[in-house]
Amino acid sequence: MRKLWNALRRPSARWSVLALVAIGIVIGIALIVLPHVGIKVTSTTEFCVSCHSMQPVYEEYKQSVHFQNASGVRAECHDCHIPPDIPGMVKRKLEASNDIYQTFIAHSIDTPEKFEAKRAELAEREWARMKENNSATCRSCHNYDAMDHAKQHPEAARQMKVAAKDNQSCIDCHKGIAHQLPDMSSGFRKQFDELRAGANDSGDTLYSIDIKPIYAAKGDKEASGSLLPASEVKVLKRDGDWLQIEITGWTESAGRQRVLTQFPGKRIFVASIRGDVQQQVKTLEKTTVADTNTEWSKLQATAWMKKGDMVNDIKPIWAYADSLYNGTCNQCHGAPEISHFDANGWIGTLNGMIGFTSLDKREERTLLKYLQMNASDTAGKAHGDKKEEK
Protein backbone atom coordinates (compact mmCIF):
# COMPACT_ATOMS: atom_id res chain seq x y z
CA MET A 1 0.00 0.00 0.00
CA ARG A 2 2.88 2.37 0.83
CA LYS A 3 4.53 1.68 -2.55
CA LEU A 4 1.25 2.43 -4.34
CA TRP A 5 0.85 5.69 -2.43
CA ASN A 6 4.41 6.74 -3.22
CA ALA A 7 3.93 5.89 -6.88
CA LEU A 8 0.82 8.05 -7.04
CA ARG A 9 2.64 10.97 -5.42
CA ARG A 10 5.78 10.67 -7.58
CA PRO A 11 5.83 12.82 -10.78
CA SER A 12 5.48 10.82 -13.99
CA ALA A 13 8.70 10.26 -15.89
CA ARG A 14 6.82 9.57 -19.11
CA TRP A 15 3.97 12.13 -19.14
CA SER A 16 4.21 15.85 -18.58
CA VAL A 17 2.04 17.58 -16.03
CA LEU A 18 0.18 19.32 -18.87
CA ALA A 19 -0.59 15.99 -20.55
CA LEU A 20 -1.87 14.51 -17.31
CA VAL A 21 -4.08 17.54 -16.70
CA ALA A 22 -5.43 17.30 -20.25
CA ILE A 23 -6.17 13.59 -19.84
CA GLY A 24 -7.92 14.33 -16.55
CA ILE A 25 -10.02 17.03 -18.19
CA VAL A 26 -11.01 14.69 -21.04
CA ILE A 27 -11.95 11.93 -18.61
CA GLY A 28 -13.91 14.41 -16.48
CA ILE A 29 -15.81 15.74 -19.48
CA ALA A 30 -16.53 12.19 -20.62
CA LEU A 31 -17.87 11.27 -17.18
CA ILE A 32 -20.20 14.27 -17.33
CA VAL A 33 -21.21 14.30 -21.00
CA LEU A 34 -21.64 10.60 -21.74
CA PRO A 35 -24.20 9.90 -18.97
CA HIS A 36 -26.04 13.10 -19.91
CA VAL A 37 -26.16 12.13 -23.58
CA GLY A 38 -27.11 8.57 -22.65
CA ILE A 39 -29.99 9.72 -20.47
CA LYS A 40 -31.13 12.20 -23.12
CA VAL A 41 -31.07 9.63 -25.93
CA THR A 42 -32.81 6.93 -23.88
CA SER A 43 -35.49 9.43 -22.88
CA THR A 44 -36.65 10.19 -26.41
CA THR A 45 -39.97 8.90 -27.65
CA GLU A 46 -38.16 7.31 -30.59
CA PHE A 47 -36.04 5.23 -28.22
CA CYS A 48 -39.04 4.29 -26.07
CA VAL A 49 -41.05 2.94 -28.99
CA SER A 50 -38.10 1.16 -30.61
CA CYS A 51 -39.19 -1.95 -28.66
CA HIS A 52 -42.03 -3.61 -30.54
CA SER A 53 -43.85 -4.27 -27.26
CA MET A 54 -44.37 -0.51 -26.96
CA GLN A 55 -46.02 -0.12 -30.37
CA PRO A 56 -49.61 -0.77 -29.17
CA VAL A 57 -49.38 1.78 -26.35
CA TYR A 58 -47.70 4.23 -28.74
CA GLU A 59 -50.72 3.98 -31.05
CA GLU A 60 -53.00 4.63 -28.05
CA TYR A 61 -50.93 7.67 -27.12
CA LYS A 62 -51.24 9.02 -30.68
CA GLN A 63 -55.01 9.14 -30.23
CA SER A 64 -54.77 11.19 -27.04
CA VAL A 65 -54.87 14.93 -26.41
CA HIS A 66 -51.29 14.77 -25.17
CA PHE A 67 -50.15 13.83 -28.69
CA GLN A 68 -52.26 16.25 -30.72
CA ASN A 69 -54.30 19.21 -29.51
CA ALA A 70 -55.44 22.72 -30.42
CA SER A 71 -52.47 24.45 -28.81
CA GLY A 72 -49.89 22.27 -30.56
CA VAL A 73 -48.09 21.31 -27.33
CA ARG A 74 -47.04 17.67 -27.25
CA ALA A 75 -46.14 15.69 -24.14
CA GLU A 76 -43.49 13.11 -25.02
CA CYS A 77 -42.92 9.83 -23.17
CA HIS A 78 -40.34 11.30 -20.80
CA ASP A 79 -42.63 14.21 -19.91
CA CYS A 80 -45.01 11.78 -18.23
CA HIS A 81 -42.85 8.84 -17.20
CA ILE A 82 -39.56 10.35 -16.01
CA PRO A 83 -39.58 12.64 -12.94
CA PRO A 84 -38.03 16.08 -13.55
CA ASP A 85 -35.75 15.97 -10.50
CA ILE A 86 -32.32 14.29 -10.82
CA PRO A 87 -32.74 11.73 -8.00
CA GLY A 88 -36.15 10.74 -9.34
CA MET A 89 -34.84 10.54 -12.89
CA VAL A 90 -31.89 8.33 -11.92
CA LYS A 91 -34.16 6.08 -9.86
CA ARG A 92 -36.58 5.72 -12.77
CA LYS A 93 -33.76 4.87 -15.17
CA LEU A 94 -32.53 2.14 -12.84
CA GLU A 95 -36.06 0.77 -12.52
CA ALA A 96 -36.39 0.77 -16.31
CA SER A 97 -33.67 -1.86 -16.52
CA ASN A 98 -36.36 -4.29 -15.39
CA ASP A 99 -38.34 -3.46 -18.53
CA ILE A 100 -35.37 -4.54 -20.64
CA TYR A 101 -35.06 -7.74 -18.61
CA GLN A 102 -38.78 -8.53 -18.93
CA THR A 103 -38.72 -7.91 -22.70
CA PHE A 104 -35.50 -9.58 -23.83
CA ILE A 105 -34.75 -12.17 -21.14
CA ALA A 106 -37.94 -13.10 -19.27
CA HIS A 107 -40.07 -12.49 -22.41
CA SER A 108 -43.05 -11.60 -20.20
CA ILE A 109 -44.30 -8.67 -22.32
CA ASP A 110 -42.81 -9.43 -25.74
CA THR A 111 -46.13 -10.20 -27.45
CA PRO A 112 -49.39 -8.20 -27.52
CA GLU A 113 -51.15 -11.02 -25.68
CA LYS A 114 -48.56 -11.13 -22.89
CA PHE A 115 -48.59 -7.36 -22.61
CA GLU A 116 -52.39 -7.28 -22.26
CA ALA A 117 -52.20 -9.94 -19.56
CA LYS A 118 -49.89 -7.66 -17.55
CA ARG A 119 -51.46 -4.33 -18.51
CA ALA A 120 -53.32 -3.95 -15.21
CA GLU A 121 -50.19 -4.75 -13.18
CA LEU A 122 -48.07 -2.32 -15.21
CA ALA A 123 -50.70 0.42 -15.01
CA GLU A 124 -51.14 0.06 -11.25
CA ARG A 125 -47.38 0.23 -10.79
CA GLU A 126 -47.20 3.45 -12.81
CA TRP A 127 -50.19 4.96 -11.01
CA ALA A 128 -48.60 4.17 -7.65
CA ARG A 129 -45.34 5.78 -8.80
CA MET A 130 -47.14 8.95 -9.86
CA LYS A 131 -49.22 8.97 -6.70
CA GLU A 132 -46.05 8.70 -4.62
CA ASN A 133 -44.50 11.84 -6.13
CA ASN A 134 -47.83 13.71 -6.30
CA SER A 135 -47.83 13.59 -10.12
CA ALA A 136 -44.59 15.58 -10.36
CA THR A 137 -44.31 14.97 -14.11
CA CYS A 138 -47.80 16.34 -14.72
CA ARG A 139 -47.01 19.42 -12.65
CA SER A 140 -44.03 20.26 -14.82
CA CYS A 141 -46.66 21.51 -17.30
CA HIS A 142 -49.87 21.89 -15.29
CA ASN A 143 -50.17 24.13 -12.25
CA TYR A 144 -53.25 24.70 -10.11
CA ASP A 145 -52.28 28.35 -9.56
CA ALA A 146 -52.03 28.97 -13.31
CA MET A 147 -55.52 27.67 -14.12
CA ASP A 148 -58.20 30.13 -15.23
CA HIS A 149 -61.37 28.39 -14.09
CA ALA A 150 -63.52 30.89 -15.98
CA LYS A 151 -62.23 29.39 -19.24
CA GLN A 152 -62.93 25.82 -18.13
CA HIS A 153 -66.14 23.84 -18.53
CA PRO A 154 -68.28 24.52 -15.42
CA GLU A 155 -68.07 20.92 -14.21
CA ALA A 156 -64.32 20.80 -14.87
CA ALA A 157 -63.86 24.06 -12.99
CA ARG A 158 -65.82 22.71 -10.02
CA GLN A 159 -63.74 19.54 -9.90
CA MET A 160 -60.44 21.38 -10.33
CA LYS A 161 -61.22 23.81 -7.51
CA VAL A 162 -61.80 20.89 -5.14
CA ALA A 163 -58.61 19.19 -6.36
CA ALA A 164 -56.58 22.37 -5.94
CA LYS A 165 -57.89 22.90 -2.42
CA ASP A 166 -56.72 19.42 -1.39
CA ASN A 167 -53.59 19.54 -3.59
CA GLN A 168 -54.84 16.32 -5.12
CA SER A 169 -52.55 14.21 -7.28
CA CYS A 170 -53.41 14.49 -10.99
CA ILE A 171 -53.38 10.73 -11.51
CA ASP A 172 -56.24 10.33 -9.02
CA CYS A 173 -58.67 11.61 -11.64
CA HIS A 174 -56.84 11.28 -14.96
CA LYS A 175 -56.04 7.60 -15.33
CA GLY A 176 -56.28 6.59 -18.97
CA ILE A 177 -55.47 10.10 -20.20
CA ALA A 178 -52.91 8.81 -22.70
CA HIS A 179 -53.28 5.02 -22.75
CA GLN A 180 -56.09 2.50 -22.75
CA LEU A 181 -57.31 1.62 -19.28
CA PRO A 182 -56.75 -1.99 -18.23
CA ASP A 183 -59.63 -4.31 -17.48
CA MET A 184 -59.52 -4.24 -13.68
CA SER A 185 -62.40 -6.69 -13.36
CA SER A 186 -60.10 -9.65 -13.95
CA GLY A 187 -58.41 -8.94 -10.63
CA PHE A 188 -61.45 -8.67 -8.38
CA ARG A 189 -63.28 -11.50 -10.18
CA LYS A 190 -60.33 -13.78 -9.63
CA GLN A 191 -60.37 -12.70 -5.99
CA PHE A 192 -64.06 -13.67 -5.75
CA ASP A 193 -63.38 -17.07 -7.31
CA GLU A 194 -60.70 -17.65 -4.69
CA LEU A 195 -63.08 -16.49 -1.95
CA ARG A 196 -65.75 -18.90 -3.16
CA ALA A 197 -63.31 -21.79 -3.56
CA GLY A 198 -61.96 -21.31 -0.04
CA ALA A 199 -65.33 -20.71 1.60
CA ASN A 200 -65.50 -22.13 5.13
CA ASP A 201 -69.07 -22.42 6.43
CA SER A 202 -68.22 -24.00 9.78
CA GLY A 203 -69.34 -22.17 12.91
CA ASP A 204 -72.56 -20.70 14.27
CA THR A 205 -72.26 -17.30 12.57
CA LEU A 206 -71.94 -17.08 8.79
CA TYR A 207 -71.83 -14.35 6.14
CA SER A 208 -73.13 -14.58 2.58
CA ILE A 209 -70.88 -13.92 -0.40
CA ASP A 210 -73.68 -14.07 -2.98
CA ILE A 211 -77.41 -13.44 -3.30
CA LYS A 212 -78.95 -16.62 -1.86
CA PRO A 213 -82.60 -17.75 -1.95
CA ILE A 214 -84.15 -18.61 1.41
CA TYR A 215 -87.05 -21.00 2.02
CA ALA A 216 -89.77 -21.42 4.62
CA ALA A 217 -89.05 -25.15 4.92
CA LYS A 218 -86.26 -27.52 3.99
CA GLY A 219 -86.78 -28.89 0.49
CA ASP A 220 -89.16 -26.16 -0.68
CA LYS A 221 -89.03 -25.45 -4.40
CA GLU A 222 -90.29 -21.87 -4.21
CA ALA A 223 -88.15 -19.30 -2.40
CA SER A 224 -89.61 -17.12 0.34
CA GLY A 225 -87.06 -14.36 0.00
CA SER A 226 -83.38 -13.66 -0.56
CA LEU A 227 -80.32 -13.19 1.61
CA LEU A 228 -78.15 -10.40 0.21
CA PRO A 229 -74.32 -10.37 0.04
CA ALA A 230 -72.28 -9.62 3.17
CA SER A 231 -75.25 -10.38 5.45
CA GLU A 232 -74.87 -12.13 8.79
CA VAL A 233 -76.97 -15.14 9.84
CA LYS A 234 -76.99 -17.43 12.86
CA VAL A 235 -76.98 -21.16 12.13
CA LEU A 236 -79.67 -22.98 14.11
CA LYS A 237 -79.46 -26.42 12.52
CA ARG A 238 -77.55 -28.37 9.89
CA ASP A 239 -79.30 -31.10 7.92
CA GLY A 240 -77.41 -32.55 4.96
CA ASP A 241 -77.08 -29.87 2.31
CA TRP A 242 -79.43 -27.54 4.16
CA LEU A 243 -78.97 -24.96 6.90
CA GLN A 244 -81.66 -23.58 9.15
CA ILE A 245 -80.77 -19.96 9.81
CA GLU A 246 -81.87 -17.00 11.87
CA ILE A 247 -81.86 -13.56 10.21
CA THR A 248 -82.13 -10.34 12.20
CA GLY A 249 -82.81 -6.91 10.75
CA TRP A 250 -84.80 -3.69 10.94
CA THR A 251 -87.87 -2.67 8.96
CA GLU A 252 -90.17 0.34 8.97
CA SER A 253 -93.09 -0.51 11.27
CA ALA A 254 -95.69 1.17 9.05
CA GLY A 255 -94.38 -0.45 5.86
CA ARG A 256 -94.97 -3.88 4.32
CA GLN A 257 -92.07 -5.28 6.36
CA ARG A 258 -90.66 -7.31 3.47
CA VAL A 259 -87.15 -5.89 3.58
CA LEU A 260 -84.77 -6.17 6.52
CA THR A 261 -82.01 -3.60 6.92
CA GLN A 262 -78.82 -3.49 8.98
CA PHE A 263 -79.79 -0.44 11.06
CA PRO A 264 -83.01 1.50 11.65
CA GLY A 265 -83.46 4.33 9.18
CA LYS A 266 -80.62 3.21 6.91
CA ARG A 267 -81.29 1.34 3.67
CA ILE A 268 -78.49 -1.18 4.12
CA PHE A 269 -80.31 -4.28 2.96
CA VAL A 270 -79.84 -7.62 4.71
CA ALA A 271 -82.62 -9.74 3.25
CA SER A 272 -86.02 -9.73 1.61
CA ILE A 273 -88.73 -11.96 3.11
CA ARG A 274 -92.21 -13.02 2.05
CA GLY A 275 -94.72 -15.83 2.47
CA ASP A 276 -94.40 -18.10 5.48
CA VAL A 277 -90.99 -16.69 6.42
CA GLN A 278 -92.53 -13.24 6.76
CA GLN A 279 -95.61 -14.54 8.59
CA GLN A 280 -93.51 -16.22 11.29
CA VAL A 281 -91.17 -13.32 12.19
CA LYS A 282 -90.70 -12.20 15.78
CA THR A 283 -90.53 -8.56 16.81
CA LEU A 284 -87.60 -8.04 19.17
CA GLU A 285 -87.81 -4.30 19.79
CA LYS A 286 -88.93 -0.98 18.34
CA THR A 287 -87.30 2.43 18.07
CA THR A 288 -88.06 5.83 16.57
CA VAL A 289 -85.58 7.41 14.17
CA ALA A 290 -85.36 11.05 15.19
CA ASP A 291 -84.41 12.45 11.76
CA THR A 292 -87.62 11.20 10.14
CA ASN A 293 -89.77 10.60 13.23
CA THR A 294 -90.60 7.11 11.94
CA GLU A 295 -90.89 3.94 13.97
CA TRP A 296 -88.74 0.96 13.07
CA SER A 297 -89.06 -2.63 14.29
CA LYS A 298 -86.25 -5.11 14.80
CA LEU A 299 -87.41 -8.46 13.42
CA GLN A 300 -86.07 -11.98 13.71
CA ALA A 301 -86.86 -14.41 10.89
CA THR A 302 -86.18 -18.15 10.68
CA ALA A 303 -85.60 -19.75 7.27
CA TRP A 304 -83.79 -22.54 5.43
CA MET A 305 -81.18 -22.27 2.72
CA LYS A 306 -78.84 -24.57 0.86
CA LYS A 307 -75.18 -24.77 1.82
CA GLY A 308 -72.60 -22.90 -0.22
CA ASP A 309 -71.39 -19.35 -0.76
CA MET A 310 -71.14 -18.72 2.99
CA VAL A 311 -68.05 -17.89 5.05
CA ASN A 312 -67.45 -17.62 8.78
CA ASP A 313 -65.41 -14.40 8.60
CA ILE A 314 -66.60 -11.09 7.16
CA LYS A 315 -63.10 -9.66 6.59
CA PRO A 316 -62.36 -11.51 3.30
CA ILE A 317 -65.66 -10.18 1.93
CA TRP A 318 -64.70 -6.60 2.77
CA ALA A 319 -61.23 -7.13 1.27
CA TYR A 320 -62.89 -8.31 -1.95
CA ALA A 321 -65.33 -5.37 -1.84
CA ASP A 322 -62.42 -2.96 -1.42
CA SER A 323 -60.91 -4.40 -4.62
CA LEU A 324 -64.28 -3.89 -6.31
CA TYR A 325 -64.27 -0.24 -5.27
CA ASN A 326 -60.72 0.49 -6.35
CA GLY A 327 -61.07 -1.55 -9.53
CA THR A 328 -64.19 0.25 -10.75
CA CYS A 329 -64.57 3.67 -9.14
CA ASN A 330 -60.95 4.62 -9.79
CA GLN A 331 -61.28 3.96 -13.52
CA CYS A 332 -62.90 7.23 -14.60
CA HIS A 333 -61.95 9.55 -11.75
CA GLY A 334 -60.50 9.57 -8.31
CA ALA A 335 -62.66 7.47 -6.02
CA PRO A 336 -64.03 9.69 -3.23
CA GLU A 337 -63.42 8.96 0.41
CA ILE A 338 -66.03 6.40 1.40
CA SER A 339 -66.95 8.47 4.45
CA HIS A 340 -67.78 11.42 2.18
CA PHE A 341 -71.40 10.18 1.92
CA ASP A 342 -73.79 8.73 4.47
CA ALA A 343 -75.26 5.24 4.10
CA ASN A 344 -78.44 6.32 2.31
CA GLY A 345 -76.56 8.86 0.21
CA TRP A 346 -74.38 6.13 -1.27
CA ILE A 347 -77.43 4.53 -2.92
CA GLY A 348 -78.03 7.44 -5.30
CA THR A 349 -74.33 8.13 -5.75
CA LEU A 350 -73.56 4.56 -6.81
CA ASN A 351 -76.67 4.36 -9.01
CA GLY A 352 -75.39 7.40 -10.90
CA MET A 353 -72.08 5.69 -11.65
CA ILE A 354 -73.04 2.03 -12.02
CA GLY A 355 -73.95 2.46 -15.69
CA PHE A 356 -70.29 3.18 -16.46
CA THR A 357 -69.17 -0.16 -15.02
CA SER A 358 -69.55 -3.81 -16.00
CA LEU A 359 -70.59 -4.99 -12.54
CA ASP A 360 -73.25 -7.68 -12.26
CA LYS A 361 -76.02 -7.59 -9.65
CA ARG A 362 -74.04 -9.54 -7.03
CA GLU A 363 -71.01 -7.29 -7.42
CA GLU A 364 -73.18 -4.18 -7.30
CA ARG A 365 -74.92 -5.33 -4.10
CA THR A 366 -71.63 -6.24 -2.44
CA LEU A 367 -70.01 -2.94 -3.35
CA LEU A 368 -73.00 -0.90 -2.17
CA LYS A 369 -73.07 -2.64 1.19
CA TYR A 370 -69.33 -2.13 1.66
CA LEU A 371 -69.69 1.58 0.94
CA GLN A 372 -72.72 1.92 3.22
CA MET A 373 -71.05 0.06 6.08
CA ASN A 374 -68.10 2.45 5.90
CA ALA A 375 -70.12 5.62 5.29
CA SER A 376 -69.98 8.79 7.38
CA ASP A 377 -72.77 7.64 9.69
CA THR A 378 -71.77 3.96 9.96
CA ALA A 379 -67.96 4.05 9.77
CA GLY A 380 -66.42 1.09 11.56
CA LYS A 381 -69.51 -1.14 11.49
CA ALA A 382 -67.98 -3.12 8.62
CA HIS A 383 -65.18 -4.24 10.89
CA GLY A 384 -67.12 -5.95 13.60
CA ASP A 385 -68.81 -3.18 15.62
CA LYS A 386 -72.23 -4.61 16.49
CA LYS A 387 -73.76 -1.51 18.04
CA GLU A 388 -77.11 -0.54 16.54
CA GLU A 389 -77.76 2.91 15.12
CA LYS A 390 -80.65 4.52 16.96
From Swiss-Prot:
Annotated protein name in UniProt: Cytochrome c-type protein TorC
Keywords: Cell inner membrane, Cell membrane, Electron transport, Heme, Iron, Membrane, Metal-binding, Transmembrane, Transmembrane helix, Transport
Pfam families cross-referenced by the UniProt entry: Cytochrom_NNT (PF03264)
Record note on modification: Binds 5 heme groups per subunit.
InterPro entries: Cytochrome_c-type_ET, Membr-bd_4haem_cyt_TorC, Multihaem_cyt_sf, NapC/NirT_cyt_c_N, NapC/NirT_cytc_sf
Function according to Swiss-Prot or TrEMBL: Part of the anaerobic respiratory chain of trimethylamine-N-oxide reductase TorA. Acts by transferring electrons from the membranous menaquinones to TorA. This transfer probably involves an electron transfer pathway from menaquinones to the N-terminal domain of TorC, then from the N-terminus to the C-terminus, and finally to TorA. TorC apocytochrome negatively autoregulates the torCAD operon probably by inhibiting the TorS kinase activity.
Lineage summary: Bacteria, Pseudomonadati, Pseudomonadota, Gammaproteobacteria, Enterobacterales
Location of the protein in the cell: Cell inner membrane
Chain residues that bind heme 1: C48, C51, H52
Gene3D superfamilies, per database record: Di-heme elbow motif domain
Periplasmic side: 38-390
Residues where heme 3 binds: C138, C141, H142
Known partners and oligomeric status: The N-terminal domain interacts with TorA. The immature C-terminal domain can bind to the N-terminal detector region of TorS.
Segments on the Cytoplasmic face: 1-16
Originating organism: Escherichia coli O157:H7
